[in-house]
Amino acid sequence: MRSISRVVDVSINTVTKLLVEAGEACANLHDAQVQDVKASKIQCDEIWSFVGTKQKNVATAKGEPEGDVWTWTAIDADTKLIVSPFVGDRSGQSAIALMDDLRDRLANRVQLTTDGHKAYLEAVEGAFGGDVDYAQLIKMYGPTPTPAGRYSPAECTGIKKVRVEGDPDRKHVSTSYVERQNLTMRMSMRRFTRLTNAFSKKVDNHMHALSLYFAFYTFTRIHKTLKVSPAKAAGITDHLWSMEEIAEMIEARQAKPMSAGLISSG
């Protein structure tokens, strides 16, 4: 944000204020538009980042850093629509928040795939009961010769598909699309780069930046395979949104009371 303030010669406080207003407007856009989603296959995953400092340094850091922060997403495998996002820790409570929100946004029964994170089990049961075809894709990892301190994951040596509830179709038990979206998110926002000094300093601003990204990804970005935006593919909008429309929406909200927004920390 400081680079933007230097380029356009305005105060960093002005840029920060715009980020907050944009985040709140985009959060409300998602909340209002992404409802009664007709989907057949949903994939869920969570991606790591940090705010202030990494978790191992929180105890000795100055100020009140948040430490590790996880962004959970549920994506429609067919339209690539991000149905539900949530920002929090990696606990069961965050999984419950994601699944409860996902349930409320769906119009029909779906096939659901997650990774093997145990927090999903109780969360899916609590949100959907038996009204879901749910499976976990569990990856198995082998030893790696890479020394300690590496930033790449261990080598995946195999996968196991485990039915949890209902009758999931094994050939559609996958997390490939949500993992690819995680990569797009990490490459689109420098806050998410692993080795960076551009990490978020406040969790609220972290969430506002994510809300802006989700609005761009969902409503204004043409997916290369779909040839339309995910929102258009899902039938929740009838046109490709422009950034000018997003900006006008921000201006229209400036005089109105702010809502709780799209995503919240656990």
Language-model segments: residues:
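Residue-level recognition of single "structural anchor" positions
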Residues: 1-266
